[in-house]
Each structure stands twice: as structure tokens, then as C-alpha cells.
Amino acid sequence: MSDNRLFTSVETLNLSSPVLEKLKLSGINTLEDFNTFTLEELRLLLQEAFLEVLPILKNFALPRNLQNLDLSEAVINILTELGMEDFQDLLQTKMAVLTKSFETNPLAFQKLNDLFKLYNHFPSISSDKEYGSRDYDYFKIRLAAPEEIRQWSYGEVTSYETINYRTYKPEISGLFCQKIFGPVVDFQCACSKKQVSIKSQFCNKCGVEFTETKVRRERMGHIELQTPIVHTWYLNSSPSRLAILLNIKTKQLEEIVYYVSYVVIDPGKTEFKPKEIITETQYSEALYEFGNTFVALTGAEAVKKLLENLNLEKTIKVLRKSLSENSKQKRESIIKRLEIIESFHQSDNKPEWMVMDVIPVLPPGLRPMVPLDGGRFATTEVNDLYRRILNRNNRLKKQMLQKAPRLIIKNEKRMLQEAVDALFDNTKTSKKNVNNVEKNRPLKSLSEMLRGKQGRFRQNLLGKRVDYSGRSVIIVGPDLEMHQCGVPREMAIILFKPFILKKLQETKGIDKKNANTIYEKMNEEVWNALEEVVKEHPVLLNRAPTLHRLGIQAFDPKLIDGKAIRLHPLVTPAFNADFDGDQMAIYVPLSLEAQAEARLLMLVSNNILDPKNGNPVVTPSQDMVLGNYYLTIEEKKDRTINSYDSAQRTAEHQFKHRNEGTFFADINEAKTAYQNKEIHLHTRIFIKPQTINLSFTEEQRQKYLMTTLGKLIFNDILPPSFPYINEPTQFNLDVKTPDAYFLPPGTNPKQFLKKLPTPKPFNKKFLSMIIACFFKQMKITETSKMLDHIKNLGFKYSTIAGITVSFADINTYSNKQELLQEVETRNIQIETWHKDGFLTDAERRRLVINEWKTIRDEIQEGLMKEFKQDNHIFMMSESGARGSVSNFTQLAGMRGLMNNPKGEIIEVPVKASFREGLKVSEFFISTHGARKGSTDTALKTAESGYLTRRLVDVTQDIVVIKEDCNSDRGFIVEAMMSDGKEIVSLKKRIMGRFASCDICHPKTNTLIVARNELIIESKAQEIITAKIKKVPIRSILTCNCEYGICAKDYGVNLATNKLVEIGEAVGVIAAQSIGEPGTQLTMRTFHTGGVASASDITQGLPRIEELFEVRKPKGKALISELKGKIKKIDKIRSQNPEIVITEENDPDTEHRYILEPNVDILVSKNNIVYPGQKLTSGSVDLKELLRVAGTTEVQKYILEEVQKVYRAQNVYISDKHIEIIIHQMFKQILIIDEGDTHLLPGTEITINKFKKANLKMLEEKKRLAVGRPIILGITRSSLRSDSLLSAASFQETTKILIDAAIKGKTDHLYGLKENVIIGGLIPAGTGILETTLFKYPKEPATTSELTKKTNQN
């Protein structure tokens, strides 16, 4: 502000006449005159007028001199050191700077704060944030004090008016007032004066500040309520926090708040007791009899008085004392009350702040009002709620001034209470909701703006739309390299606009404006600039739904014509994409950091392995498989063809392979012969191994190799370290080419070929094995090149093969009718037995169904034998390109048994195949299954998506934060079995993990793996060879880290096959790995058969949910509660069966278990049973197992059960992902005895808090607290998160915010969600370097410094 502004006359200011008169009398004629007085002198001179002058003093920073502000010498010295010359400098300083400078002198800082309060000035807290900086350490939430609400406010809203319908300008003192909230147009006041870009000046006439219009998104107002109002969150939410705090029943408290009853504050001469609740009638009678000698209040006023009278410290002491004396039921209610009272006592909240005298008004930018055509307005519903409050508040004010009757005022107060309730939460009000007139539904309150998928958290904070993005349909790009994608020029020209403009400015030496003009013309220069810009600039492609991290990957863009994005065919499995109209979104990383991350971490060619199990995710499919299958077929010349035109086709075949057994010098000679049609791709030929650049033994090099040209072409893409692949076997791949294919010199080739068996062609499974083997030996970049070669070969030779499907390819099975006749006869026999009473209906049904199943299998086997090797449909199935044996049986054999809508098998089968055609009745039977399939898929997708969301939420804060937590415990693993079959091998379970103790050979005692050594594949094989059945490994379940986990407990990162790095977000990866295959799981709960009492066995997705949510299982198994011996099993017909177990230590003590009738008993007499062992079939109740057998057994059980469900669908997920989820289910502990800690018995707290409390007691040599572990379902675990932001954005938003506000909770921002919400870098990946957990030195530290640090650690 220029100094000449200080010579403005006070008469031009917007001041009342009495104030102007006082200023004149004090000798203050201009603003400069204020500088001649101190603050205290001004206060004494102006008296009550001082408050009216204060805003002017603040706006012009008066008095200027720091000495005139009544600050102590110490404060002035600190401010001078900071380089502040006057009051204006002080007002422009950020709070962060002041806080730091006054750290050592809190009393001086208090003085400065008092000055700010007087001037209603609150310095800016946030400093200018740079990219990725973290200048905040935590996020705190608490109740707002009335003074704070007034301090946030820029003025009181007194009128319910919004916008003038004629001028479209905001009304003065209304909900959109420019004086309170700031100007509607940048630097323009309400009377349309303009001021150019100088802030902090006010219009003399209308009082609006000249500033940017964006302040309307941050400036708040307030409404001064004529009567106190209770905040509905603390009254109407269940359980009512206010009711618990005041120890009043919720219903009674509601009656007080809504002016139905009165509460006695001071009984005076009456017979009432303090805090007694009386009715309106009782109050009127007492008032009539005793007059004003007693005090009884109603409404929020009464609640406020009760809260103010609460002595928290005293109440805590009384309650703690009564804890030990009362019954269990009373103790629970005392603990609930204690929790709330202690929350208030330990935080800087006051209970009376739950009753409001003033409410804040949201900035108008967040509740806009837009004029529509025809003079109507579209408005946010919050505005209607505010208008209702203002209407009722103003009416109440008027009635109070007019001294209206008590009844009328009471009714108006109740209506005001309801209006404020509706503003904060319009769903909870016990009274009638405030409805939208047009749509007849409750208006959207502030709580609704936060809740649910459309709420602020999930819609705007966790998922934002981003610029520089586009979307288009995808088509195949067979000519692309692995790391490329085709981007349409039309898209790229817009997406890369800023880079093109920069390029134009650099090359042509022009300014921004001219560059824009050239860009608009879209001439040759612009397109050339685009070609330059796109080079080496990766883009991200994403396909919804993004089920796992491979759903968004980086590619190098290649500009193409047309309008569709082109995608490399090999990356489709990772995106689960196909080319039937799928769309993909494209994003451009802008900053250099983002581009580097995209290239190094997200490029497709670096993401070849699936994070869930470490298998290659980019395996060739369909045409690529078919082409390679066709290429590697080997045919004998002397084969006879039996089908149609057999003579002609046999002759053609023999002519094609007429030169079988020919010797060639090298591959080029063989190719020339093929081009001249002397040999075929499948003809068996001989070649010298020396001419092939692959691995052979010395002995093999002296002989001739028998192979085909097709196989020579295929082997040409393999590196020299590989053996020549001549047959699809593990031996050929891992060891060498079998010697059987080598012809010793001097041997008759014709005789040699006759004896030699024909190897199978290379199918999809074998191609995957080659890729996995290649990946182990080579770098990622080499693998991606090799994959491109496989793709090119596949497409080329599937085109050359010209494989088609025709009607003639489907041959019906010759023996079908005889087989059907046999079954019909047998079924008639079964029917006869049933009629004669030898079979029950259920048994008859089972036998009939089994007969049809057997016959279908027989037809299937026969069909496969009749199918010829060169049948195109057979080739598709055999190669793994498309279709399965079952599909062909339905095409050419018989469709078989179908299910009805309930999922039960229909007895009558579909006898026809699709080749023969179905009857109407058969077609009808088939429709049930098809319809059920579609509905199941739709339900499954939603269910699976919700499961993934819960899993991500429960694990999102699990990040690898250190190398080693030095845990001395381990987790013992063994091969996983189900029904006697091995479902996960021991080798798979231990590979890539660390040993928790030394593992020695059981016979020789030689060390195989040392403690804390990584078990690599060769070591795992040694362990298996040594016949070790149980291996102790480091596990996430035994990790000692306070937050996150350590690298040693996690092991190898399956996506890279290297040790996991610090900062890896392993929690999210685990959740995605379990959730992503969720759609492949079944939705069924299977019936065990016709037995009425047999329980349903839950499988598939419902079973996973049952385990992770810790629900009581259907068909619960009975478990043993002790270690002992089974004495007897009684199966008495009239009663339920009974198992008797004797204790191991005390054989005389017997435990009896009564069973349900018809259950399968899994144990027999004299068996030894252990705690937690299943006695009957079914699923175990996890809470029961935890009580009986302890944590480790439950963790092991969950791990095995989850694996069983996924393995049943042939999905393999690494144990470590499931372990992370289980780790999160066991993060809380139930306090049994509090010892000398501040913990409350019966409460559930995190293990970290429990450990800290006990460590403190150990230091002070006091009694420790005792607790027992509890198991939480993933939803409950998410809601109990230490982070209030993470929990609130998940579910039950208001409930979590209510509790967090009462406790004055602090969120230390350890997880990912919290940081995304407040717009910071996540503490994972490259962002972990910025967090408070990791302080890396800016400059390289000297060796002496590093040694010093290590010693300190």
C-alpha cells in the first residue's frame, strides 16, 4: 500500500456519525493520525467505538509502528530479527515462520496471538508447496469452539436472500454477499468499480474488497443463533454420545432438546432433585407454586448448562472406582461413558462445544447458484437448508424482541433446532425430514455431501479426473513392438499440445502467442513438431475395470492414421482386453519425473510377470498359438488318411513329403527347397547341428539332427545358450535335445525314421514354459524381443496354414446310438427296482444321473480317438488356441445333463449334439443354464469388485519400510493338501522367502540354507531332495515393524523376481492379487445331495468372503477343545451321535460332544486329537478356533482355506499376499486387565498402542496390562484403522468423524489413502523419500558422519 493512502480523510470511510465525532475530538482526521497513538490509548479514547474502527485498522495495518502495538520487548526483538519493520510486514508473515521463531518462547507467542485475535487476523498456515514436498506432518480434527467459528468468518450472514432476480447480483448480508465472501468478478466491487491487481483495498461505498474471485471458494461466513442448538451428530447418531456423556437415556435427552421436557438445574425450594427430568405440566405447576426460586431449563440451553457443570476429572475418578464394583452389564455402560469422558479430558475439546451458539456458512463457491433460462435458478440444496435456518432465526429474534408468549418462542426454537439438524444431517433427524418440494426426497445435507460413492471423499478426493487424457476404441496392432502402442494423430496433436507449443517456440524463436497461432493452423510445421515431441515420451494406457496394477501400463506412442488406438496383441491378457469394441483411456505423463517413472517402472516390456504368482502374464494366445502349433507339426510320409477322398488325399500327402529323410547343409538350403515345393514345413529332414547356433553336446555335433523345417524356423528365435527344441518336454527345455533324434553317420535314414516316434507339436502350455525358461536366463528386454518373434511367427504361419472351421470338420461319433440304447435299457432296470421298493427316489435319481454322466464321458473318449490329427477343430483345441474337449463333445457327441434354475441337475439329458440339432424340449432345458450363467456373471462382478475394495482398504497402509525387523519368530510351512491331493507344493511355498532358522540336511547335517538367507530355486530343490517336509520361513505374520512390514519377511517381489525394495506398496498389490481373480470364482453354495440334514458347503466367492469377514460358517464343523484321546463314538439311532474324549494328562476326565444327526465323523476310536482339530466335516468357526488353538493355528487355517478355493478354480496366488490380509485381521487386542496403564478393560486397541503402554509401565516398574488377541473381519479392521481419513472415506463416514472429533484425533498420514486425500505424494515408491519416516541427507555425507550415524543406530 502506498503511503499517500494514509492521508485519506476519516470522513470518506464507512463509519457512523457518533464514531466520526469521537475521532475528531481525539484529533484523528486522517488515517496517518492513528500512528501517533498506541493501541491501548486508542482503546481508552474511543471506548465502545473502538470495535467499529478495528476493521479499518486491520485493513490499513494501523498503527504501523511495532512499538505502538503494546507488544513486549522480547516479541519486538524476535520480529525485528525476522526482518519486520512495521505492522504491515507482520500481517503478511506466514504462521509457519512465526511458530518456528517463537518455539522457545511460548509466552511471547501467546501475546502475539492475542493481538491477532483482537484484529481478527489468522496468518496463512500453508506455505507454497513444491512438487512432492511434505510440509505437513499430520492431520487433526476436533470440535470447533464458537470463537474459532467467528474467527474463520468474514462476516455475519443475516438475510436469507441469495441473488437478486433482476440484476443477478448477490444481495447484501445474504448467503452470497460480496462484502462477506469476496467479489463475484476479479478486482471489481459490488458497485462495479474496478481496481487492478492490488489486494487488500476496500471500496469506500459498498465495502467489498478488491481481490480475486477465487476467494469465494475459501471465505466462510457465520450465523449467530438466537438460542443454543445441539449438534445433531452427537445427539441423534447411535449410540448418542451426548446421552452417554450426561448419563441420560437417549429418548429423555431428545425430549429435552426438542422442548418436550425440562431438566432441573437448581431445585431451590421444590422437591425436585438436580438433573431430574420433569414434564411441561410439572414445570408449570412448580412455576405457579414456587415462582422463580428454582431453575429448570429445556432445549439446547439446558443441555449446554449440564455440559458446563460437568466436572470431568472428578467423574473419571468416580467411574474408575465403580468399575471394579459393578456387574458385567453395568461395567460395559461405565466403560462406554469413561471412553467418551476421557476423550474430552485428554483432548483440547470442551463438552459444551457440542451445543452451538454460532454456525459456519460454507463459502458460496462450494454451494453455487446458477441462473437458468426463464428467470429460474439452479441451486445446491444446502442453500435451501441455510435459508430455512436464517428465516427461523430472524423470526425468533423478532419474537424475542416483541416478548412473544413462551409457547410461541418455544415452538420457534424447536423449529430452529430442526432446521439446523437438517443442515448437518438430514437423514438422522427423528422428526420429519426436510424434503425437496419437486422431487419429494430429503434435501442433501452436509453429511450427505461427504457420504458414499458420490460423496466428497470418494468422488472428488480419492478419484479425480485428469487433464491430458483421451479415450478411444482399441484394435490390434500386429506390427507393433512389445513396448509400443499406436496413437491416432488426431488424438496426439491435442494430447501433446503444450510440448508442441514449446517445440515451436524453440525452433522458430517465437513467443507463446505466435506459437498458438501456428498451432491453430495445424500446418506441416505442427505435424513435424508432433513427430519430434512424441519420440521417447511414454504414454499410459488404462482399461476399466482396473483390477490389478497391470491394468494401467506405459507404452511408447507410435503415430498412426485412423481413429482407434492400436494395442500389441500380447498385452491383452494383462488388461483382460479383446478387440470386440473395448475402449481404453490414454494419459500423458507431463513432468520429467513422471515420464521417468513411466519408462522405468510401468513400461509393458518391464511388466512381463504377474505380481500375484510370478508367472509370465504375456503368453501368446489364439492365432499366435495356432501358428506356432502348425509350424512345429511333424508328419510321417507313410501315413494313410481314412476320411472322405481318402485315396486322393493320401496321394497328395505322400507327394508333399516325397523328399522325407533328405539331408541339408543348413537352414537356408532347406528354405530354398521349401520355396521350390520340394519339401513341406512338416517334412522330416536331416541337418548338421554345427550349422545351428544353439547348444549341443560334442557327441551330438558329430551326428545328423532329425527335425523339420518348421522347427528350424522356430528354433531360430532362441538364444545360443538354449538347447535345440525338438519335442515339447521339460527335459528338452532344461537339459538337452534327446539323443534319439540324432542319426549316427553310416546309418540308413529310412530305417531310422521308421523306428522314430513322432513328437507332438508345441502347444500353448509349452510356449509358456519356453517363455518362463527364457525369462530366467535373459534380461527383461531380451524376453520382450523374443515374445515379439513368437508373435510374428504365430501370425505368419497361422495365415499360411489357412485353418478354418467347416461343417465337414464336425464328425458325429459312430457308436453313439448303441451307447445310448445301452443306457436306456439300464435306466429301465433302475426304474423297475425303484417301483419294487429296492431304491428310494433319491437313490434312483443319483443312479440315473451317474449313468448319463458315464455315457457322456465314454462318447467324449471315443470322439477324441476318431478325431484326426489334421482336423482343424482338433488342432485348435489341442494347441490351446480355443475351445476345450467339452465343447467338441457338445458339437459332435452329445450335450449331456443340464441344470435347472435352482442349480440342481435335471434327470433328462440333452441327447443330441449341436451338429445333429436340438429338439424344442432339449433347447428349452438348455436355456436355464445359459440364463443362470449370465445372471451369475453380473452378480459375481459386483460382488468381486466390492471384495477388492474392502481388501484394498484394509491393506493400503502396508508398505515395505525397512530391510529387516530382526524378528526371531518364523512360520512353519509344508505342502498344502486337500482331500489327499497336493494343491500347493512345498517348493512353491518356500521359493523366494527367507529362512527363519538354519535348515540342515536331516541325514548328513550339512547346512542347506542359513538363517535369514533367501531360498532360491536351487536351494528349494535341495530341501525337497533332502525330504524335509516342514520348513520354517520368515513371514509377514511374525513381522515386528510398528507400521508396514520389512523386506526380509516379505521376500522376493514376484513381479520382478528380485528382493522387494523399500517403498513397495505390497498391501495394495496383495489386495489386487486376491481380488483380481475373484470374478473367476463361482457364486454357488453346493448341495451335498438328497440327504435332508447334510449341510451346504460354501465355496467360491462366498467362502472367501466368509473367511475374510470372519462370519459364522454354514455347516459348522465341531472341533476338539483339548489334547486327548477318543474313548468312544456312540451312534445311537434314537439320539444324536456322541463323541467322548479323555484328557491326555487326566484320563479320568471326560469331555462329551453331542453331534448333529447324519454328519460325517472324521475321527475314530483311540485317535489322538489336538486342540482345534476337526471332529466332523464342515467349516471351522474362526473365533472358536482362536479361543481353543491360538493365533498361529487360525492364521494357518485361513491361509489354507483361501488357497483351496482359488486352487479349485486353477488360480495360484502366492501365500505372501494372503498373509498380508491375515496380518491386518490380527492387528487388535482385547484388554482383559488394565494393570496400572490408562487403558480401559473390555476395550479393543491396536497391538502397537498396547505395546507402547506396557513399555511405559516396564520403565516405571508398574503393573502391566493384560490382553488377548482378537480376530477382525476386513470391514471392521478397515473401520478401526489408525487413520481417521482412511476409515472415513471407506464406510460409515459420519460415525468415524463423530468419534474422531470428540477424541481430537490425529492422523499421522502413514497410509496411501490419507495422503491422496490431502493431495500429497503417497509414502510409497519414489514418494517414500519425502516422508517423515525417511530423512535422506541432501548432500552426500562424509564417511566419518556415516560411521557416527551407524554407531548411534
Curated annotation (Swiss-Prot):
Residues 1-117 are annotated as: Unknown. Zn(2+) binds at residues 189, 191, 203, 206. Its cofactor is Mg(2+); Zn(2+). It is an enzyme of class 2 (transferase). It comes from the Bacteria. Residues 118-1353 are annotated as: DNA-directed RNA polymerase subunit beta'. InterPro entries: DNA-dir_RpoC_beta_prime, DNA-dir_RpoC_beta_prime_bact, RNA_pol_asu, RNA_pol_N, RNA_pol_Rpb1_1, RNA_pol_Rpb1_3, RNA_pol_Rpb1_3_sf, RNA_pol_Rpb1_4. Pfam families: RNA_pol_Rpb1_1 (PF04997), RNA_pol_Rpb1_2 (PF00623), RNA_pol_Rpb1_3 (PF04983), RNA_pol_Rpb1_4 (PF05000), RNA_pol_Rpb1_5 (PF04998). GO terms for molecular function: DNA binding; DNA-directed RNA polymerase activity; magnesium ion binding; zinc ion binding. Signal peptide: none annotated. GO terms for biological process: DNA-templated transcription. Keywords: DNA-directed RNA polymerase, Magnesium, Metal-binding, Nucleotidyltransferase, Transcription, Transferase, Zinc. Mg(2+) binds at residues 578, 580, 582. Binds 1 Mg(2+) ion per subunit. Its EC number is 2.7.7.6. GO terms for cellular component: DNA-directed RNA polymerase complex. HAMAP family: RNApol_bact_RpoC. Belongs to the RNA polymerase beta' chain family. DNA-dependent RNA polymerase catalyzes the transcription of DNA into RNA using the four ribonucleoside triphosphates as substrates. This is DNA-directed RNA polymerase subunit beta'. It comes from Aster yellows witches'-broom phytoplasma (strain AYWB).
